[in-house]
């Protein structure tokens, strides 16, 4: 007969097919249902519209949404690098232009799009009563070198995992809090270091997942997290 694992797999497969093929699964992706003024508030570019889509997915009951930080061009707008290269601000020797300018790899291009889209998401979630039960995490996998690696027309910075920042909002996080501190050039952590597992534990805490939850079988059982949640961030 069928095992429990096989039955679970069939059930999940059926639910996934229903989600992908049914009208309830398609509707969140129909962004033209939104007022144009709201779409423009997010920004008529890939990042803005993807964050609007994320809100619609959350509103429809999706429990976990990941949005790539691609700051590509709006329709009819020139510029914008490929999706794999947003925020890849190495500078001239990588053929990516000035990391501090307004070109498609520059902070003058990327940051305004992020500011516009992320702030619109926060306001929109809050207005719909969704922010308190939705944790928003904005983070990359590393920072950038504190010292500029190239001079001249196209300066930039290399990868720097030793010190960087993340933004958390909603999900019980109290607004306006700052946790930790770097030195004055952002080279190293000066106060309250946070490890990746601590960030993970903080996310689990926000979602109500017990940190002593055991996962894995057949000799590989382990706690779901080895980190410590940053409890002072919660109001």
Feature locations, PLM:
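Ligand-binding pockets and gating/stacking loops
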Residues: 1-235
């Amino acid at each position: 007969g069928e095992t429990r694992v096989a039955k679970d797999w069939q059930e999940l497969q059926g639910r996934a097919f229903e989600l992908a093929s049914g009208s309830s699964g398609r509707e969140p992706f129909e962004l033209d249902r939104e007022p144009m003024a709201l779409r423009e508030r997010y920004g008529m570019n890939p990042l803005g519209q993807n964050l609007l889509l994320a809100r619609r997915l959350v509103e429809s009951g999706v429990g976990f949404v990941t949005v790539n930080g691609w700051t590509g061009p709006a329709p009819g707008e020139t510029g914008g690098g490929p999706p794999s290269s947003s925020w890849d601000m190495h500078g001239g020797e990588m053929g990516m232009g000035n990391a501090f300018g307004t070109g498609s790899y520059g902070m003058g291009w990327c940051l305004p799009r992020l500011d516009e889209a992320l702030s619109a998401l926060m306001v929109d979630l809050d207005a719909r009563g969704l922010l308190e039960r939705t944790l928003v995490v904005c983070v990359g996998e590393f920072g950038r070198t504190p010292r500029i690696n190239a001079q001249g027309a196209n300066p930039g910075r290399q990868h720097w995992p030793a010190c960087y920042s993340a933004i958390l909002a909603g999900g019980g996080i109290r607004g306006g809090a700052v946790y930790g501190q770097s030195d004055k050039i952002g080279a190293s952590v000066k106060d309250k270091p946070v490890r990746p597992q601590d960030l993970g534990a903080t996310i689990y805490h926000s979602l109500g997942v017990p940190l002593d939850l055991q996962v894995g079988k057949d000799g590989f059982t382990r706690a779901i997290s080895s980190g410590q949640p940053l409890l002072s961030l919660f109001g």
